[in-house]
């Protein structure tokens, strides 16, 4: 999801893009060698760009970490420590969104050869370490502000699977990587006049739930503006939802609201409203109309500018389109999708679409 023009208490608007990037280099055994700061060029959207770096000779594993405050990181003291010990221990506060990605080169291949010839599209996907929460009042309701309450003040930089002992995260993963420090942030005293909030992962236990207070009024009736409280519940089970990094939680108002109160303070203790529906989107978009489904493989990547022909290179974006069934099936040649530019002021106008129906 887009991350521009956002004003929130939980994430500084100046911290929503890539401000700085570090590369943690490990050998084939996963032992730390050194940290490298690449020369980078960040695009105007602050969410993509290119980088160049010289890494140690025996590097086989690289963790990419963007926007993390590393002033207290003891590089010399960490030499020889395993990646499973170093990376899961990196903790961030809510002042900036932190991005993380990892590449691992096979033991029988040189790193440069792997990046140039094997790494898919020569790109490294980066995952945000916070979740995104938005409101949609639809045609029924105008939301004039909201605030998240009872959330964690800190979060881990990278997702680490404690069961497999691997960094095997993808957008379909549902495990949490919580810090040892479960300190809660100070709850706000008023809503933020924003359409987006960012929060750290949370197990969201029933006895200590994260919740949202929002302010708004029915369409065409601004004099009826009130405050409401909503719990983040699964629509099927009515159990609290786990808050997972790099996921988008959309709170949609689907009917007339009850239990509105005149002040933010009163809303903190009022019963949750009804007629609320929450949907969860991975950062990798998936859209369905009930009959057909479109899945886009990549929306957030870092490009390697050191490759041959960087100025004239072509970028391949993969998608899957077919029937909304299990398993998904391709459509016929006559039904294949059309791909066009919506807006383009940085690339050559040519665009091609190869749809494989095999």
Regions found by a protein language model. Give the residues of each.
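Tryptophan-paired
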Residues: 6-77, 111, 132-245, 319, ...
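Extracellular beta-sheet/turn segments enriched in Thr/Pro/Gly and aliphatic residues
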Residues: 84-138, 235-285
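Surface-exposed binding patches on compact interaction domains or structured appendages
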Residues: 294-298, 310-316, 320-357
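Beta-sheet-dominated interaction scaffolds and their linkers
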Residues: 124-125, 269-318
